[in-house]
Amino acid sequence: MVFMFLTFTVGTNAQENRKAFTAEEQEIVDLSKCKWDWMSEKNVEKLAELFHENSQFVHMGGYWGKQQELETIRTGGIWYKKAEIHDVQVKFAAGTATVYSRIHLNSEVGGNAVRFPFIVTEVYVMENGKWQLSTLAFTKTLDE
């Protein structure tokens, strides 16, 4: 009986903490998750399709464009091993979708394993009927 109560309580709390997205928001959330998976897998072919030709990537050490980001991922200069996503919000405005995520990023940078807390901003633009990533910016938080 106690087990059933605990199961119900934990299940209810998990559902309460779960964010409900509209279908349009869920499409962007799913695309963002795919991006993290492709980055972890170093799948530069899929990423090249996703990244807009004029995309920019803002890191702690600088910013650069699409080709440099793809090369950095391909060569392992930065290996995005796993993004632990804690919170996600999606906002739409003027043909763009912006994803704000609070994450812990487990990665390898220059051969060193690192784990940082970030607020990540992803800006997607709708072009030729599909969403493309225009901006990916990492803001390190003071949590750790």
Each language-model region and where it sits:
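Short, low-complexity N-terminal intrinsically disordered segments enriched in polar/charged residues
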Residues: 11-50, 92-95, 144
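Short beta-strand edge/turn micro-motifs at domain boundaries
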Residues: 117-144
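A short gly/proline-enriched turn/hairpin at secondary-structure junctions
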Residues: 39, 50-64, 73-79
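Surface-exposed, charged secondary-structure patches
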Residues: 73-112
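Bacterial N-terminal signal peptides
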Residues: 1-9
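Hydrophobic pocket/interface hotspot
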Residues: 35, 47-48, 55, 69, ...
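A mature extracytoplasmic/lumenal domain signature
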Residues: 51, 61-62, 89, 103-105, ...
